[in-house]
A protein has these predicted regions:
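Bacterial N-terminal signal peptides that target proteins for export
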Residues: 2-10
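Bacterial N-terminal signal peptides
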Residues: 10-18
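Short, cationic, amphipathic peptide segments
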Residues: 26-28
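Glycan-processing catalytic domains of CAZymes
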Residues: 30-271
């Protein structure tokens, strides 16, 4: 069926909308709780703890805790902050976890293959910001409600994995930048989790980086743009001994830990 002839004004508006992505549509409506760039922007040299399992050990003399968004209560976050600590809240932004409170709001069409080694998680189709955007915004709002100073969005490198979707690097960049803008609109600090091949394109959007096992896989040089920009690089090794990586981590001005894979309370700091 042929379309009716559009007016010049309507045609102009229609064509303008054709060039606007869903990410562009969502971002202007992100609530800015606090105006200005007052969110936490750590420099290298921050002491920290990353604990996502077990009873939280709140007695460590560190500057920052990275804890689970869903499992950590607002009162626990308040306790840590009363001790002068920054609190980062972990959330997966690129995978579906079947045990989360909001697992049932993800439609099947955005659920891909299971993550290798993680039978409770499936990759998300991050090209569908129209679907995932509102879900992730609610998670960030929860972080604000609980008093988190920032978020650690995990699994934001689906394009380089066997996700079950034909994701492109550009789609990943669009999604990751959108996450950063959404976090900042809520006055939340945000870190780039892994995704090493896109560091150069994303370092200006993220406030810090968090990496797993770059010394084991000999790819830590890819994180140097963060340090060169005066931004902290946090990281962990699971298998290597501290004598293997700590001196190099310190010389690169990285803030590195030795941790158990379960990310319980045990830690050894290189600093």
């Amino acid at each position: 069926m042929r379309m009716k002839k559009m007016s010049a004004v309507y045609m102009g508006l229609f064509c303008m909308l054709c060039t606007v992505s869903m990410a562009d549509v969502l971002v202007p409506y992100l609530p800015a709780y606090i105006h200005g760039s007052s969110w936490w922007q750590p420099k290298p040299g921050v002491s920290w703890q990353w604990q996502l399992s077990g009873t939280l050990d709140t007695d460590l003399d560190v500057d920052m805790y990275d804890v689970d968004l869903f499992d950590t209560s607002a009162s626990m976050i308040s306790l840590l902050k009363s001790q002068g600590k920054k609190v980062i809240c972990y959330m997966s932004a690129g995978s579906w976890e079947n045990y989360r409170d909001d697992a049932n709001v993800f439609p099947e069409e955005v659920l891909g293959k299971y993550l290798d080694g993680w039978p409770d998680e499936r990759w998300l189709d991050i090209s569908r910001i129209d679907i995932l955007g509102p879900i992730m915004l609610r998670r960030m709002d929860l972080a604000v409600e609980k008093g988190c100073d920032g978020i650690e969005p995990d699994n934001i490198d689906g394009y380089s994995n066997d996700s079950g979707f034909a994701l492109t690097s550009e789609e990943q960049l669009t999604y990751n930048r959108w996450l950063a803008e959404a976090a900042h609109a809520r006055n939340l600090s945000i870190g780039l989790k892994n995704d090493l091949d896109q560091v150069q394109d994303l370092v200006s959007y993220f406030d810090w980086a968090l990496n797993e096992q770059c010394f084991q896989y000999d790819e830590c040089d890819l994180l140097l743009p963060f340090v060169q920009a005066g931004k902290a690089v946090f990281g962990v090794e699971y298998s290597l001994s501290t004598t293997t990586f700590c001196s190099q981590a310190n010389s690169m001005n990285f803030d590195w830990l030795k941790k158990n894979l379960s990310l319980d309370s045990w830690r050894v700091s290189c600093r």
